[in-house]
């Protein structure tokens, strides 16, 4: 679905579900996908593989050719990891992650590269690129910096919602606040994906009303 000002296509978990799909490439090119625990798995991409970058750039450009609206205030392309922990551990990805102290090292480098090439291919000044700081990519990298047209969507899934995020006595939330501060130092487009209900048990009571106001004020 296309919104005039908003996301082009899906807004989450787009890598392998929308871009470089394994049902097209995995059998013939397993090297396009994550090397995890000694084998290639189709649940995530190998983000340092140059062919993967080429494919994703081409697929993004194809979507933009069809759906780009130059009159929109902003349109967002989501380049976001799938919902699992099967990140790539190949030599190149590991070296980049190690150099950045975070698996976000490969993700931000990948998104920066795709964004640069897409912008060079056409007049897409109102297009920005969105990625996650989520689970294994939640910690900010120490070397690579997101481009000005890259959004980092920081997810609070590991947080405690019985306390405010800035409660100094809550270890889970102290870790999140540290990550929020570190991302804020290197990125001017930090968005928040906050968890204001229990997605696993939607009908269960989720007593977070007392912390919601303060958490929004923090953001």
For the regions a language model picked out, list residue spans one by one:
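Short, acidic/polar
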Residues: 59, 176-180, 208-218
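Substrate-binding cleft/loops of secretory-pathway carbohydrate-active enzymes
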Residues: 130-158, 203-211
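Short, surface-exposed, polar/charged, turn-prone segments marking secondary-structure boundaries
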Residues: 105-107, 156-162, 218-219
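Feature activates predominantly on carbohydrate-active enzymes
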Residues: 1-111, 119, 123, 133, ...
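Glycoside hydrolase catalytic-domain groove-lining segments
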Residues: 140-148, 154-198
